[in-house]
From Swiss-Prot:
Membrane association type: Peripheral membrane protein
Organism: Aliarcobacter butzleri (strain RM4018) (Arcobacter butzleri)
Substrates-to-products reaction catalysed: ATP + H2O + cellular proteinSide 1 = ADP + phosphate + cellular proteinSide 2
NCBIfam families linked to this entry: PRK09200.1, PRK12904.1, secA
Annotated GO CC locations: cell envelope Sec protein transport complex; cytosol; plasma membrane
Protein name: Protein translocase subunit SecA
Major subcellular location class: membrane
UniProt xrefs under InterPro entries: Helicase_ATP-bd (IPR014001), Helicase_C-like (IPR001650), P-loop_NTPase (IPR027417), SEC_C_motif (IPR004027), SecA (IPR000185), SecA_CS (IPR020937), SecA_DEAD (IPR011115), SecA_motor_DEAD (IPR014018)
Localization (cell): Cell inner membrane; Cytoplasm
Enzyme Commission code: 7.4.2.8
């Protein structure tokens, strides 16, 4: 019914495009005004727009038509490319903070330049995010002549830029290209520096995310993490792996009626749909016996049970050459969406160590999170977020709910001529691959190039062996040959070429066809399996039929494919049985294709809920992160009044001390617990005071007197240094105490999140419990930070120095030591849960902070001392 109304009245998208077409016509009408101008005159016209916007006399919307018309004319002159009307529409969609869905080959790079040029007029910086360094550099260099013609500076932040000064220069440009990882990690590093001058980013104004579905959907479950060594060790992985292999896999037998309970067999049940493994009652008993413990789920055995959970996942859910490969004595993750090897990335929560134990490679140490953020929360920091991709409509709901982004499908400049055929479904994988090979042979002999998409390295190598046996020449592109990707994809359109590729096939790389190939039917796409996401299938199809080229696509499936086996084969199997399909035969119908798409929708919905669930938890941490980072940024500002902050903390310290001593307003003086105060002063602040010296008649007098005593003692201690040096010492100490406490808090939050799901068994909502407990932990964290700064400031020992130059040098050395430490932590960082192998400091080694004390007596004991020895 909805389709009928859409055909009569037009879809919402059609109406949106119609409005944009009118605006595009208005831009085109301005074209003649600028075509006759000289280059200098055209540049001056654009500079006038910039001045109007920056003075606040005009908004970006006010100057959109002129900006687009000038940029279009400049593009024609400088790049020899004139944006089509549909590209103008795409540019307007991006400017409005929406997602422009544009088919492959429709010139997204040029579309982006229109919105970038307009928004760069404000002078607040525009970021353009791509999926890899190659595309960031390529796009920046291709468009640099255009942007420079318009008076903008252009930068690119890529992995090779190690020097902070170079990175700062790139961010200072009007327009900065880079990858999502580089932008995200620079943000985290900026919030770990000790001087505001060391920050490289200058704010988050406007961002365009290219391949937005890949970054904001596929990578949404991948947090960016900077990590360092941890004191929390878990040495149970080998034992857990050994036990996991001894257990017997069982199955869940569904009850025949509602009155009956499900029956389980064996020691554990594998749930492929949710990628989970659950122990049965029989399994619990077996594991407790093998581990030699009475209760696997008691608090003292938490590490054991966690290790076993990960060992079961590693052995029965994660597959070699599908989810990961073993290379150079390491487990390397295979990106499930691109098929690429993710060098340096590690699974979190001990799963990577469990895989290392499974494959018999070196088990690397676990590490502790120092700073983290998800892409979801990083990109939501921008004042305006927009995106481009060839495939977004299937995820439109998620873009709207999570990022508040609308998706607008931009019409192609030339209608798509590719023919997308119905799926062919076979009973077995063997029959399917036989049919695929026969089709490949037919196309190859005809001379028509064919690109064959596979779901994993394992499947691509299986198909490769069959083609070798049949003597059909071909090229394989999977994560193991990713170095040759550019050339393999470029050659995929040659006459008679047969290219087998995992999902990595060429985002951002064009397969250009000659007239001879187009006459043969263009590029043929064969999918050997449906991906869990329709979007990935659409990307494969989109490799053919670019810019109005002819082409064809078809998927070959079997009932043994994971998607059909786990999510949707019963109905399809029933159809095949009713039709009496024999071995080697297939069915092809729109009804079956719809059934497959429904199975995909189920999986997409499940993944959406998973990402939404992750965001709900991360939002809790994100609110806390904002508070900590905001205060940290204040501390870095030269004009921040750190002395007043210390005064506040000192007052709070006294108030908390009186509360702990059970001394309240209105209480009789005889009941005041003076001994408690005297003992705490000695324990916390390392100075002695007599009871007689602090006796007062009321709570208010006592509070005021104690605050005054602490101020006098502190001022006397700090009198040996200048006011400037005093502020610098207070600031650096505060930063390190804040960072140290935040790191421990992140570890505690990770631990809380790991076990919070068990609250569900007690009829409690785990998310509500997590919010409640993490809030209490955060309040405690803030209190501890304030307390700790007072303790450290009172216990540091400052030497009286006549030579102020030496004092300056000592302080500079302290800063240098801390910054080196931070840089060391961020070496070789990558996506996902980054687990560095930083050397752990032995307890008896000199402390790296420069105090001259042993580590166990300094930072290893009660937090960092910033090169200032603790003393009474």
């Amino acid at each position: 019914m909805l389709n009928v109304f859409s055909k009569i009245f037009g879809t919402r998208n059609d109406k949106e495009v119609k409005k944009y077409r009118k605006k595009a016509d208005a831009i085109t009408a301005l074209e003649s005004k600028y075509t006759d101008l000289s280059d200098d005159e055209l540049k001056n016209e654009f500079q006038k727009l910039k001045e109007l916007v920056q003075k606040g006399e005009k908004t970006l919307d006010n100057v959109l038509f002129q900006s687009f018309a000038i940029t279009r004319e400049a593009s024609r002159r400088v790049l020899n490319m004139r944006p089509y009307d549909v590209q103008l529409i795409g540019g307007m969609v991006l400017h409005e903070g929406r997602i422009a869905e544009m088919k492959t080959g429709e010139g997204k790079t040029l579309v982006g330049s229109l919105a970038v040029s307009l928004n760069a007029l404000e002078g607040k910086g525009v970021h353009v995010v791509t999926v890899n360094d190659y595309l960031a550099s390529r796009d920046a260099n291709e468009l640099r002549p255009l942007y420079e013609f318009l008076g903008f500076s252009v930068g690119a932040v890529v992995g090779g830029l190690k020097d902070d000064e170079q990175r700062r220069e790139q961010y200072a440009c009007d327009i900065t290209y880079g990858t999502n990882n580089e932008f995200g990690f620079d943000y985290l590093r900026d919030n770990m520096c000790f001087d505001i001058k060391d920050k490289v980013q200058r704010g988050h104004n406007y961002v365009i995310v290219d391949e937005v579905d890949s970054i904001l959907i596929d990578e949404a479950r991948t947090p960016l993490i900077i990590s360092g060594p941890t004191n929390h060790k878990n040495s149970n992985y080998l034992k857990a792996n050994e036990i996991a292999l001894k257990l017997e896999k069982g199955e869940l037998i569904e009850p025949k009626s509602a009155a009956e309970k499900p029956i389980t067999t064996g020691d554990f049940i594998v749930d492929e749909k949710n990628r989970a493994v659950t122990l049965t009652e029989q399994g619990h008993e077996a594991v407790e016996k093998l581990f030699g413990v009475d209760n696997l789920y008691s608090i003292e055995n938490a590490m054991l049970s966690h290790s076993l959970d990960q060992a079961l996942k590693a052995n029965y859910i994660f597959k070699k050459d599908v989810d990961y490969v073993v290379k150079d004595n390491q487990i390397i993750i295979v990106d499930e969406f691109t098929g690429r090897l993710s060098e340096g990335r590690r699974f979190s929560e001990g799963l990577h160590q469990a895989l290392e134990a499974k494959e018999g490679v070196t088990i690397q140490d676990e590490s502790q999170t120092l700073a983290d953020i998800t892409f979801q929360n990083y990109f939501r920091m921008y004042k305006k977020l927009a995106g481009m991709t060839g495939t977004a409509q299937t995820e439109a709901t998620e873009f709207a709910q999570i990022y508040n982004l609308d998706v607008v499908s931009i019409p192609t400049n030339i209608p798509v001529k590719r023919i997308d055929k119905n799926d062919l479904i076979y009973k077995s994988e063997k029959e399917k691959f036989e049919a695929v090979c026969n089709k490949i042979k037919e196309l190859h002999e005809k001379g028509q190039p064919v690109l064959v998409g596979t779901a994993s390295i394992e499947k691509s190598e299986k198909l490769h062996k069959i083609l070798v046996d049949k003597k059909i020449p071909h090229t394989v592109l999977n994560a193991k040959q990713h170095e040759k990707e550019g050339k393999i994809i470029a050659d995929a359109g040659q006459k008679g070429a047969v290219t087998i590729a995992t999902n990595m096939a060429g985002r951002g790389v064009d397969i250009k066809l000659t007239k001879e190939i187009l006459d043969l039917g263009g590029l043929a796409i064969i999918g050997t399996e449906r991906h869990e996401s329709r979007r990935i299938d659409n990307q494969l199809r989109g490799r053919s039929g670019r810019q109005g080229d002819v082409g064809e696509s078809q998927f070959y499936l079997s009932l043994e494919d994971n998607l059909l086996r786990i999510f949707g084969s019963d109905r399809i199997k029933g159809i095949m049985e009713r039709l009496g399909i024999e071995e080697g035969e297939h069915i092809e119908s729109r009804m079956v294709t719809r059934a497959v798409e429904n199975a995909q929708k189920k999986v997409e919905s499940m993944h959406f809920e998973s990402r939404k669930h992750l965001l709900e938890y991360d939002d809790v941490a994100n609110q806390q992160r904002k508070v900590i980072y905001s205060f940290r940024n204040d501390l870095l500002k030269p004009d921040y009044d750190i002395t007043s902050k210390i005064d506040e903390n000192r007052i709070e310290y006294v108030q908390n001390l009186l509360t702990e001593a059970n001394i309240t307003s209105g209480m009789a003086e005889d009941d005041f617990n003076y001994e408690f105060i005297v003992n705490r002063f000695l324990e916390d602040l390392h100075f002695k005071i007599n009871v007689e010296d602090i006796k007062k008649e009321s709570y208010e007098e006592l509070e005021e007197h104690l605050i005054s005593i602490l101020k006098d003692v502190y001022d006397k201690k700090m009198s040996v240094t200048s006011l400037e040096q005093k502020s610098e010492i207070e600031r650096i100490l505060y930063l390190q105490i804040l960072d140290s406490a935040w790191r421990e808090h992140l570890y505690a939050m990770d631990t809380l999140k790991t076990g919070i799901g068990l609250r569900g068994y007690n009829q409690k909502d785990p998310l509500v419990e997590y919010k409640k407990e993490s809030y209490n932990m955060f309040i405690e964290l803030i209190g501890n930070i304030k307390n700790e700064i007072i303790k450290i400031l009172f216990t540091i020992q400052l030497q009286s120095q006549e030579d102020k130059q030496k004092e300056q040098e000592a302080l500079a050395k302290m800063k240098e030591q801390m910054e080196k430490s931070t840089e060391h932590i961020t070496t070789n960082i990558a996506q996902e849960a980054v687990k560095n192998s930083d050397k752990k400091i032995a307890r008896n080694e000199p402390c790296p902070c420069g105090s001259g004390l042993k580590y166990k007596q300094c930072c290893g004991k009660s937090g960092p001392k910033i090169g200032l020895a603790a003393g009474k």
